[in-house]
Design a protein with these regions (language model features):
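Conserved alpha/beta-hydrolase "acid-adjacent" motif
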Residues: 216-221
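Flexible "cap/lid" loop of the alpha/beta hydrolase fold
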Residues: 116-124, 130-164
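Short beta-strand/loop motif that positions the catalytic acidic residue
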Residues: 203, 209-211
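Conserved HGGG/HGGXW glycine-rich cap/lid loop of the alpha/beta-hydrolase fold
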Residues: 23-77
């Protein structure tokens, strides 16, 4: 994951902190402030910031729409509080941020763990969801190889990607909490149970499922998710892994914006 878009995307953004369930949640709003269309909410990956997950995509995504990007609990500019990281809580925090901003309905683009949060939002608060983009995410533990899950039992902060460490240390209000953030992120994945096929079938929002052909998420699993979702489209990106999917491929944000802009059948 690279940071090349981080400076450019902040030039004309509205920035602030929102009081959300005991957090002071950092957010930015990009794009035309008076745009009456449905805003897009970006849900970043684990151990990341919205810049590391979406920095290279955000300028294109923000053309013609408002884009809300934020750092969730204990990530980036949002300080941690004394509670674990859970997908349910992250979903509640995202919806509370929208309520704080006076937004009743939005599109959601979740990458990796952000995709898991998007799934939880669609299940817990379907009324706030117009469309979903779920990128490099899984709905149960069959979505990745056993070795992936086993790796969390002996994860060390030394194994954390350097770009993610540097991004955290650059902006975190309490940089010394990096080891705690890493430990909480590992625990969240150790506790991951996912959702049943019946729950995935109950998501009726139009959904674009995106995965790389060399992703941590098995492409076959993405196909299964696509088949379960009642109103889904599927994109399997060639020669793409879990990290390179965040690189500035011009056709990725174009594919996403085309999906969001096309009227749902």
């Amino acid at each position: 994951m690279i940071l090349t878009g981080a400076v450019a995307i902040g030039c004309a953004a509205q920035k602030g902190y929102a009081p959300v369930h005991g957090l002071q949640m950092y957010y930015e709003i990009h794009g035309a402030s008076g745009d009456p269309g449905t805003p897009l909410v970006l849900l970043h990956g684990g151990g990341s910031t919205f810049e590391t997950s979406f920095g290279d995509l955000l300028p294109t995504l923000a053309r013609g729409r408002r884009v809300i990007a934020y750092d969730r609990q204990g990530h980036g500019r949002t300080a941690d509080v004394d509670r674990p990281f859970t997908f349910q809580q992250s979903a509640e925090d995202a919806v509370a941020l929208l309520h704080h901003l006076g937004i009743q309905r939005a599109d959601f683009f979740g990458y990796s763990n952000g995709g898991h949060i998007a799934i939880q939002i669609a299940l817990s608060h379907p009324e706030v969801v117009r469309k979903l983009v779920i990128e490099s995410a899984m709905f149960d533990r069959e979505g990745s190889d056993p070795a992936f899950w086993e790796s969390f039992h002996h994860a060390r902060i030394e194994d954390m990607p350097r770009d993610l460490k540097e991004a955290y240390l650059k902006v975190a209000p309490r940089p010394e909490e990096l080891p705690a953030m890493f430990a909480k992120s590992v625990k969240q994945m150790l506790d991951f149970k996912g959702w049943s096929a019946e729950e995935i079938r109950s998501i009726h929002a139009p959904t674009l499922v995106v995965v790389g052909d060399r992703d941590l998420v098995r492409p076959e699993h993405a196909v299964t998710m696509y088949q379960l979702l009642p109103r889904a489209q599927l994109a399997i990106l060639p020669q793409t892994d879990h990290l390179s999917i965040s690189h500035p491929l011009a056709w990725v944000p174009t594919m996403v914006t085309t999906f969001l802009d096309t009227p749902a059948p």
